[in-house]
Amino acid sequence: MVCFTQGLKLDLEKPIEEQGPLDVIIHKLTDVILEADQNDAQAQELVQRFQDYIDTHPETIILDPLPAIRTLLDRCRSYELIRRLEGYMQDDRICSPPFMELASQCGEDTIAELKKHRLTFPFICKTRVAHGTNSHEVPSDDTGTPEAVDRRECVLEERIRQRLRWKMAIIFSEDGLKDVKPQCVIQSFINHNAVLYKVFVVGDSYTVVERPSLKNFPTGLSDRKSIFFNSHNVSKPESSSDLTALDVVEGVCRPPSDDVIRKISRNLREALGISLFGIDVIINNRTGQHAVIDINAFPGYEGVPEFFTELINHIQVVLQDQNPEAPQFSQNSTAPEQAASICADRACPAASGFVTMATKEAWLVEDDPSNSKRLQHQRLSCNLPPNFQNCVAPMATKASSQ
């Protein structure tokens, strides 16, 4: 059976073998992985059960590999990857903002460390854990969840929120260092005329959506008090606040280069072996360079109405790559019919199918009635040399065909 409307939901609390055989598993286990990494026994058991299935079924396509997801959940690791990619690509149009980890309270040596890492005021502080709204906001009393979310899912989300009880912050002076709460990642703030470009990648295609962002601030030390904010709210399509209100456009103001976005997306996909991810890009208003400020595992794809179609297309491609002798897709067939044909050609048992363990966002495709601008929808070609992939991403798992 192949389900394209909602997907079969995989229950990790039951033996996975009894729920297969499985051709493709699409998951969003970020909350569970975070809990497991924080020594939650039940979450560790669930992740291990899933990993055991992957190890014993290398033929199953995993979207996306767990080690790569762990990299994206850790801003230090993902920022280091961005830095190394910048060095590899050697493209003057691309830059990675300087950053450093702050593992303890600011002390006498903090200023020296900032200078060592080429960080200047103002800079932005973010939680080291990077995952959806949880890594951007302080939990509030009205964080309800839809009825469709499982009880286990609700518990995990609430636990994560309770542990991430601070907002992002912009620090303008040495006096403001007292507002920095470890563990966090400090990243240079780059003026970008209050425009954020969210790149949503699905396999070999991507869509760029324009969103509001933080306004420009004077460079260097100032007597401004630290600003605390919820970046998820700031970058919402309908966002309107003093933080995003730009008095005047300064310096360079232009949309991102399609060639640069394609290059960044392609190299990230090859380095990590992932298919479903988002990239936050800003344009430095002084140099015109493209700066990658965050990478997200399996984002919400808001503003990408054709997400589900692109996902099905990508599944078709990975199934075809795994079984080149399968019939080629017919131009007159629908996406579900084509993928079903592949599955049938592989002699899939009746219980075989595409399975999702995703949270509420995973299969959600919303229209975009907001003011966000959809700029580009393009396809990638992947040619990152294997030696670089091995250098930056030994975490790629054999369970994925990417």
Annotate each PLM feature:
Residues 3-20:
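A short, well-structured beta->alpha microelement
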Residues 7-9, 64, 278:
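A structural preference for short, hydrophobic beta-strand core positions in alpha/beta folds
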Residues 19, 29-33, 43-240, 247-250, ...:
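Active-site nucleotide/adenylate-binding loops and adjacent lid/helix of ATP-dependent enzymes
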Residues 21-25:
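Conserved acidic residues
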Residues 27, 125, 187, 279, ...:
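Active-site flanking residues adjacent to catalytic metal/cofactor-binding acidic residues
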Residues 217-225, 301-310:
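A short, polar/charged loop-to-alpha-helix boundary motif
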Residues 257-258, 265-305, 373:
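Conserved metal-phosphate-binding beta-hairpin within the catalytic cores
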Residues 266, 308-316:
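Amphipathic alpha-helical segments that line or abut small-molecule/effector binding pockets
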